[in-house]
């Protein structure tokens, strides 16, 4: 009974987190349509978060009705004489004197800007989130300096202290962070090494653990690790009874298992040790040359039992980082879509609403920062999806507007109806396919 209650609580938490994230992302997207439409002289009749019966509303001085509806699975802006910012073709009849205030009657540049503003708002949201997080958390200082020491399992010697500047590990110079990561890849598996550090102005040698320990930094949703209950901060002490001291040992043992079950002994801060049985999954993993299939349990490693000392970045540095991270998500979405269409990766990589909701719930469970960062990731992905040139999506209507700019006339009403029907069928098919993957590709 306790397990059932716990599972129901987890489902409820996932739903709440998903609704909150979706409302923020859709709200920003639709506000992009609204504000640019307003600047373009297009009158918005309704701005709605959610669909269905109205729960709350107010009308502003411009005549726009702002409302929250009962079904929190999206939202829309309804412009004068039209259905929403992404609609196509003739809208509802309006007074000819007001035609300029409709989406259909606005100049081409106004229509293009209004529709493009939705995805652009998503990209801006992602950039702001990533920039804000990096501004608050800080960036690692250039020298390899310990910020905060993490808890270590019993029997693991860690004499490092906050403020230590790492100079070498086992005789290997560590002048910068890439050198530390290189040491983590190259040093053999061992319980402890000599770390030379600068402490209080003097060089001292202390004992410390492997620089790339089997410490879990992240757990992928819908993975073997997630299903077993592993969490960030867990430390893998042994695999099938054999002690491990470096993260790469886990990867090697998972590959060697060839899909067979593995037994992990895991230490969790504040709870002690426990055993977990996991069955790795065969998944597509991006590489420098494309993709390759590997057996994975769905965990990423951390860079040691400490966090780096940080400094506050300048506003432009934080903004550049935010833009770079948003661009990386867009590029990754493009390459992933192409890899799926070209058959480089399996169709199970396309998830639907269930997998997105589960990922959102897991991010919220991990912590507020993880949840906010996930909203940034999801916002960029949704922005990219919306600019695809598929009728009923924003990108489809941008394609129609481009056709109009080139030819001097819009597509015929018949062509719009046919293309919109095809686009709607494609989007619905994709949603159903993603949902079926959520169920069948677990």
Each model region followed by its residue ranges:
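Hydrophobic membrane-targeting alpha-helices
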Residues: 128, 132-136, 383, 387, ...
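Functional transmembrane alpha-helices
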Residues: 1-5, 9, 94-109, 213-227, ...
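A short glycine-leucine-enriched loop at secondary-structure breakpoints
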Residues: 153-165, 184-188, 224-235, 252-258, ...
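PDZ/PDZ-like peptide-tail recognition elements
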Residues: 112-150, 178-221, 226, 275-309
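Internal alpha-helical transmembrane segments
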Residues: 27-28, 39, 75, 79-87, ...
